[in-house]
Design a protein with these regions (language model features):
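Beta-strand-enriched, solvent-exposed domains that form extended recognition/catalytic surfaces
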Residues: 1-2
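Residues within mature, well-folded domains
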Residues: 5-183
């Protein structure tokens, strides 16, 4: 499990790694925020406190360390590949007052990749608009689904209401929730 070691962060010279080229504090803050869907709880807590500071050097060090811990040989390429997916998610799943990576669908997409199949039901009588994402293989699990629902299709904010994947929200009454729409 990845831990934040401040002595390791301090040993990183930002001028010698790719993150040192990110000189705008708002940009590095935003890049760090995009890591949340693939971060551990410890990383998320550390990052949330870090982006509240004005310490761009530590942000650059953390950003590099985050990617080096996932791909020691090519951390920059790992980041660039991930950022392509962040832009894709932002384009597809941005909701009112939320960037795509901040939404439930964006988080699931960034964490697990594109689903193998998506069933979209936006106009079913008596049902709120919903999507069911199927993953045939999900890490070490097989045939897993994620159910997203919105009460207002105009907002594009589909919230995760059920999954049978380990570690995700499980709700045995998800069908009742979807079909509780009254006119």
């Amino acid at each position: 499990n990845y831990q934040i070691d401040n002595s390791i962060l301090a040993s990183i010279d930002p001028t010698k790694v790719f993150s040192g080229n990110i000189n705008n504090i708002d940009t590095i803050r935003e890049y760090i925020r995009t890591l949340s869907p693939i971060s551990s709880q410890i990383e998320r807590e550390y990052a949330n406190s870090l982006v509240k500071t004005d310490d761009i050097t530590t942000m650059q060090q953390y950003f590099y360390s985050f990617w080096a811990s996932r791909n020691a040989l090519s951390p920059q390429i790992e980041w660039e590949n991930y950022y392509v997916q962040v832009k894709r998610v932002n384009n597809s799943f941005t909701a009112v007052r939320m960037k795509g990576y901040e939404t439930d669908r964006g988080r699931v997409f960034l964490k697990y990749g594109a689903p193998d199949r998506i069933v979209e039901n936006y106009n079913e009588a008596g049902a709120y608009p919903y999507e069911i994402w199927h993953y045939y293989t999900l890490e070490k699990q097989r045939n897993k689904k994620f159910v997203f629902m919105t009460r207002d299709i105009a907002t594009n904010d589909f919230q995760l209401i059920h999954s049978d994947a380990v570690g995700e929200l499980s709700n045995s009454r998800w069908t009742t929730e979807i079909y509780s729409r009254t006119y």
